[in-house]
């Protein structure tokens, strides 16, 4: 079964970038919360960069997944589509939960700094810092597991369809594809209808 970087590593890299963003925040906290003039606002830096990078990688994975979906959905069970979408949902839930934890952390640190209670500032930040790391790792593993399972199962069923072992129609998304006639006017006569042959693993 053919593999390439585009199809099978974007989800992993996206979740890795997200986790690293919150892990590096612990290093940032050690420098920004222990100086003579602690600054809580810098705690947004690495998580923000991690979220942006992760979102870009995941965007391309979703884009490529959806590119041929209207035509290839007839050849694999629709439950794998829901499995993939569940992975996407968990990914964004991961971001949401960690942004909330980060906001609580910055608010707590800002209040303590404004009260000029610099003693134990970093120690008080550790629980939320490590909670964010733990949550990001846990939810990232779930997201990767769901997305990779969907990719693999779809690959397998597309290859079976290519070999003449199609999936039962009642298990697939059999809704018809809406064709834009304006876009097909310029196509040559004799184009073949969508089928399972060709590049079967672009999902």
Curated annotation (Swiss-Prot):
Biased composition (Polar residues): 194-203
Region feature (Disordered): 164-203
Membrane topology per record: Multi-pass membrane protein
Keyword Translocase: no
Biased composition (Basic and acidic residues): 164-174, 182-191
Cellular-component GO terms for this entry: plasma membrane
Keywords: Cell membrane, Membrane, Transmembrane, Transmembrane helix
Entry's localization field: Cell membrane
InterPro entries per UniProt: DUF5453
Pfam families, per database record: DUF5453
Transmembrane region(s): 9-29, 42-62, 86-106, 126-146
Superkingdom in the source lineage: Bacteria
Protein name per Swiss-Prot or TrEMBL: Uncharacterized protein MG028 homolog
Native organism: Mycoplasma pneumoniae (strain ATCC 29342 / M129 / Subtype 1)
């Amino acid at each position: 079964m053919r593999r390439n970087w585009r199809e099978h590593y974007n989800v992993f890299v996206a979740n890795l970038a997200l986790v690293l963003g919150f892990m590096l925040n612990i290093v940032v906290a050690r420098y920004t919360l222990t100086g003579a003039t602690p600054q809580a606002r810098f705690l947004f830096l690495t998580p923000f960069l991690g979220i942006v990078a992760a979102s870009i990688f995941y965007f391309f994975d979703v884009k490529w997944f959806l590119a041929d979906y209207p035509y290839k959905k007839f050849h694999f069970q629709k439950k794998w589509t829901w499995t993939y979408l569940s992975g996407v949902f968990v990914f964004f839930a991961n971001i949401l939960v960690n942004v909330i934890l980060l906001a609580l952390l910055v608010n707590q640190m800002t209040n303590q700094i404004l009260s000029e209670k610099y003693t134990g500032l970093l120690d008080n930040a550790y629980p939320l810092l490590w909670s964010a790391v733990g949550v990001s790792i846990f939810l990232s593993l779930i997201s990767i597991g769901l997305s990779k399972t969907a990719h693999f199962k779809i690959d397998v069923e597309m290859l079976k369809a290519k070999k003449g072992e199609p999936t039962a129609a009642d298990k697939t998304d059999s809704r018809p594809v809406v064709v834009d006639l304006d876009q097909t006017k310029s196509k040559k006569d004799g184009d073949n209808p969508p089928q399972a042959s060709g590049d079967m693993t672009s999902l």
